C-alpha cells in the first residue's frame, strides 16, 4: 500500500470497508481506518454487494450450494449470515458510515471519476493488415470491387449492379465498415489459395459487394434482396458474415487467423448457457435437499418450449403437494433462477479480430480444445460494442463436394468447382422431382423427400423455396398448403390492392409475385411492411428483430399495431392486415431469410448434379466425409447400387483407408466404388496405416489368426 501510495495516480490507494452488521463491524472499521492512515490510503465505503434486493439472499445461498455441490443446509459459513449484501440507498450508507465521513467522500470521489464513462468509450479498431499499400481501407475495397466487377462482367456491367454497388459502397463508407469487408475477403482468398471450398451465407448474401468479391454465391439483384437486411445505418452494429468451410479443413483457417493476427488479437467468442426450466429445477431441487425422483419428475414436467403454466401449477398437475414449504420454496427459487447465466461455452465459430491487443479489452482464456483461445464475451456483448465478428463455420457437404471434384479430376480429368458446374440441368431437376435425394444437401430428410414431388422443382428458385418451406415458420404461419395449391393451379393467386390514392394496384405482386402471393422469407416480411404499411427500411428491420426475439411480446404488439394501422390507412382490409401479420409472426423465429436459402440452394444443386451425373464419385465422397448427413454408410452403399454403381468390398490388397474409385466398364460412369478400411468397424486409422505400409501388400495372404483378428472388427474383409 505504501508503494502504491508513492505512485502518481488520479486517486490514492483505496481500502474497501463494509458494514455487514455481523457484530464486529466497529472493530473492523477501526482496524481499516488505522491501516489507511498508516499507509496513506483512503478508506472507501462499500457494501460488498452480491444481490440487488434483500429478497435475493435465498437465491444467493442456493447458487452457493450449487457451486459447492452441497445442500443449502450443509453450507455452513458459506451461507449468507443475513441479507445485508444488497444495493443500499445513500441514506443507509450515510447512517452506517456516520463516524467515517471521509470514507463516504472517497466513494463519491470514485464515482466522480467514472461518471462520464460509457461502454461506447471502449473503442474498437479494425485490423489494418488487409490494407493495400498507400490506400485507405475504403480505397482498397473500392479497388478490389472494381477489379472483381471487371472480371465478372468483362463486356458491360449491368446498370442495376452498378447502382447497387454504389449504394452499398456509400453506406459502407459512411459506417466505416471497409476494413471488415477487406478482412473477410482476405480469409476467403487464403482458403481458396489452399484449395479449401468455402461459401458465405446468411444475411451477407444480401450484399452485391460480397457477391462480386466471391464471398457469397448469390446475386442479390437477381433475387431482389434487401441490403438493409445485412447492413443498416439505424442498427448501429457491425455486419456479421457467416462463412462455411470444409468441415475437416476449417482448423487450417482458424490457425491461419491466429498466425496472421496473433493470439493476443484474435479469439473465438463465448456463448452463454442459461438455466432453463429443467436445469433450474434439477439444480435448485438438489440444493434444497429434494430427492432425486422428485426433482426428476418435476424436471420432466417443466421440459419443453412454450411453457405457459408456472412451475407451481405444473407441480400441482403432477400430484405434488405445493403447500409443502420446502417444495414451494424450491419451485419459487427455480422460477427466479431461470435465464440466469449457468456457464460459458465456446461459440461454434465466431471469431473476433482487433487491431490492438484484445487482451486489453476483455478477458481471453485458453479453451478446452487445444490451440484455441476464447473471449469471455458472447455475441450480444460483441454486437453491443460494435466489435467485428466473422463466423468461421464447418460444413460437411463442402468437404464432400471437394472430395467429389478431386476424384473426378483424378479419374476423368474434369476441372470442376462450385462456380463452373453446368447450370439448369434438366436431368438433375427430374431426379429431385422423384425425391431421389439420398445424400443431397438439405433435401435428404423424410420431410424434404415428401415435399419434393409436391413442389416439383424445375429451376434454381424452386430449390430456394424447397429449402425454406420445410421449416416450422412457414408451417406455423399456414403458408405451405396455400403455396402448393397455387403452384399446382388449384387455387387462384390474388394480390389485394391498396386505395389508388396510396399506391399502384400491383404493389403486393412486386413483393410476393415469385412466391405466388405467400410470404415465405424474412426479406418478404420486411418488404411487405415497407410497401403495404409504410414502414421505413429501418423500421422493417426492427420488426424482423422483434419477431426473432419472440420473448419480447411488448415489442411485437407495438409493431402489430403499427403494421395493421398502416395497411388499413392505405386501404387494405383489416382482416387482411391481421392475416399478414399472423403470417409474419408465424415464421419470424423459425423462417429462413431468402439470402440464406439461396446460399444453401447452390449446394443443393451442386450435390444433386454430382449425384445424378457421377454417382460413384458422389457416394465415395459421402463415405469419406462421414460423419455427416442423415444416412449411415450401408444406406449410402445401397443407394449407389440402385444407381448402377458396382460396390466392391473392403480388400486388404486393394483398399486404402478412404474409399476409392476403380475402373469398371460394367458400373455406371465406368467407375466402381471400392470401400475403404475406414468402414471396418473398430479398426483404428493408425492400425490401418500400418497394414497399408506393409511390404508386398498386393501379395498378402491372410493367416487364420489375422482373419480372426480382423473379423473381430465386424467389417467385411476380402483376401486374395
Language model features by range: what are they?
Residues 49-71, 237, 241-243, 622:
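Short alpha-helix plus adjacent loop in nuclease-associated cores
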Residues 15-18, 42-46, 118-121, 200, ...:
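A structural signal for short, well-ordered beta-strand segments and their strand-loop junctions
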Residues 1-60, 95-98, 143, 147-150, ...:
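Domain-core and long-helix interface of multi-subunit machines
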Residues 43-45, 123, 141, 542:
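Conserved acidic, metal-coordinating active-site core of Asp-based
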Amino acid at each position: 500500500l505504501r508503494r502504491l501510495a508513492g505512485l502518481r495516480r488520479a486517486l490514492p490507494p483505496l481500502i474497501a470497508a463494509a458494514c455487514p452488521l455481523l457484530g464486529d463491524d466497529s472493530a473492523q472499521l477501526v482496524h481499516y481506518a488505522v491501516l489507511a492512515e498508516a499507509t496513506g490510503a483512503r478508506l472507501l465505503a462499500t457494501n460488498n454487494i452480491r444481490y440487488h434486493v434483500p429478497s435475493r439472499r435465498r437465491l444467493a445461498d442456493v447458487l452457493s450450494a450449487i457451486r459447492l455441490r452441497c445442500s443449502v443446509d450443509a453450507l455452513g459459513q458459506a451461507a449468507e449470515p443475513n441479507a445485508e449484501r444488497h444495493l443500499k440507498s445513500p441514506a443507509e450508507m450515510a447512517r452506517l458510515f456516520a463516524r467515517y465521513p471521509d470514507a463516504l467522500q472517497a466513494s463519491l470521489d470514485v464515482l466522480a471519476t467514472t461518471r462520464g464513462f460509457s461502454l461506447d468509450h471502449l473503442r474498437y479498431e479494425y485490423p489494418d493488415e488487409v490494407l493495400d499499400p498507400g490506400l485507405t481501407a475504403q480505397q482498397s475495397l473500392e479497388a478490389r470491387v472494381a477489379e472483381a466487377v471487371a472480371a465478372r462482367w468483362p463486356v458491360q456491367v449491368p446498370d442495376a449492379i452498378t447502382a447497387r454497388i454504389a449504394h452499398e459502397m456509400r453506406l459502407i463508407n459512411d459506417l466505416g465498415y471497409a476494413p471488415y469487408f477487406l478482412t473477410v475477403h482476405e480469409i476467403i482468398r487464403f482458403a481458396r489459395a489452399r484449395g479449401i471450398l468455402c461459401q458465405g451465407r446468411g444475411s451477407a448474401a444480401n450484399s452485391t459487394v460480397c457477391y462480386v468479391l466471391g464471398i457469397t454465391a448469390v446475386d442479390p439483384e437477381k433475387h431482389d434482396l434487401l441490403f438493409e437486411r445485412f447492413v443498416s445505418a439505424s442498427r448501429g452494429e457491425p455486419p456479421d458474415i457467416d462463412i462455411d468451410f470444409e468441415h475437416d479443413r476449417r482448423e487450417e483457417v482458424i490457425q491461419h487467423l491466429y498466425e496472421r493476427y496473433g493470439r493476443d488479437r484474435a479469439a473465438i467468442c463465448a456463448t452463454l448457457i442459461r438455466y432453463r426450466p429443467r436445469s433450474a429445477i434439477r439444480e435448485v431441487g438438489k440444493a434444497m435437499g429434494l430427492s432425486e425422483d422428485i426433482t426428476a419428475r418435476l424436471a420432466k414436467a417443466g421440459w419443453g418450449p412454450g411453457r405457459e403454466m408456472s412451475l407451481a401449477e405444473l407441480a400441482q398437475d403432477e400430484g405434488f403437494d405445493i403447500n409443502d414449504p420446502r417444495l414451494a420454496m424450491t419451485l419459487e427459487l427455480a422460477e427466479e433462477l431461470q435465464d440466469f447465466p449457468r456457464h460459458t461455452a465456446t461459440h461454434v465459430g465466431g471469431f473476433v479480430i482487433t487491431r490492438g491487443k484484445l487482451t486489453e479489452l476483455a478477458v481471453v482464456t485458453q479453451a478446452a480444445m487445444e490451440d484455441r483461445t476464447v473471449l469471455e464475451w458472447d455475441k450480444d456483448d460483441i454486437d453491443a460494442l460494435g466489435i467485428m465478428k466473422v463466423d468461421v463455420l464447418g460444413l460437411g457437404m463442402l468437404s464432400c463436394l471437394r472430395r467429389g471434384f478431386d476424384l473426378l479430376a483424378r479419374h476423368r480429368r474434369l476441372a470442376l468447382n462450385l462456380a463452373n458446374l453446368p447450370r439448369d440441368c434438366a436431368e438433375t431437376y427430374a431426379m429431385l422431382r422423384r425425391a431421389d435425394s439420398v445424400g443431397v444437401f438439405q433435401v435428404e430428410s423424410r420431410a424434404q423427400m415428401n415435399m419434393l414431388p409436391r413442389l416439383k422443382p424445375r429451376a434454381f428458385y424452386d430449390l430456394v423455396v424447397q429449402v425454406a418451406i420445410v421449416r416450422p415458420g412457414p408451417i406455423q404461419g399456414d403458408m405451405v398448403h396455400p403455396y402448393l395449391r397455387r403452384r399446382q393451379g388449384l387455387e387462384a393467386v390474388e394480390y389485394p390492392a391498396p386505395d389508388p390514392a396510396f399506391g399502384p394496384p400491383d404493389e403486393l405482386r412486386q413483393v410476393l409475385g415469385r412466391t405466388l402471393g405467400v410470404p415465405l422469407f424474412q426479406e418478404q416480411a420486411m418488404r411487405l411492411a415497407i410497401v403495404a404499411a409504410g414502414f421505413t427500411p429501418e423500421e422493417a428491420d426492427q420488426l424482423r428483430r422483434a419477431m426473432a426475439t419472440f420473448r419480447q411480446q411488448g415489442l411485437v404488439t407495438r409493431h402489430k399495431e403499427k403494421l395493421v394501422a398502416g395497411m388499413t390507412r392505405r386501404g387494405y382490409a383489416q382482416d387482411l392486415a391481421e392475416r399478414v401479420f399472423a403470417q409474419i409472426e408465424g415464421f419470424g423465429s423459425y423462417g429462413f431469410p431468402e439470402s440464406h436459402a439461396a446460399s444453401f440452394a447452390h449446394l443443393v444443386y451442386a450435390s444433386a448434379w454430382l449425384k445424378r451425373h457421377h454417382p460413384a464419385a458422389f457416394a465415395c465422397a459421402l463415405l469419406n466425409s462421414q460423419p455427416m448427413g442423415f444416412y449411415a454408410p450401408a444406406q449410402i452403399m445401397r443407394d449407389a447400387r440402385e444407381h448402377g454403381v458396382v460396390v466392391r468390398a473392403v480388400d486388404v490388397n486393394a483398399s486404402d483407408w478412404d474409399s476409392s474409385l476403380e475402373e469398371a466398364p460394367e458400373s455406371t460412369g465406368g467407375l466402381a466404388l471400392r470401400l475403404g478400411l475406414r468402414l471396418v468397424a473398430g479398426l483404428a486409422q493408425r492400425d490401418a496405416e500400418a497394414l497399408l505400409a506393409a511390404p508386398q501388400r498386393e501379395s498378402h495372404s491372410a493367416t487364420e489368426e489375422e482373419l480372426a483378428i480382423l473379423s473381430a472388427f465386424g467389417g467385411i474383409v476380402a483376401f486374395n
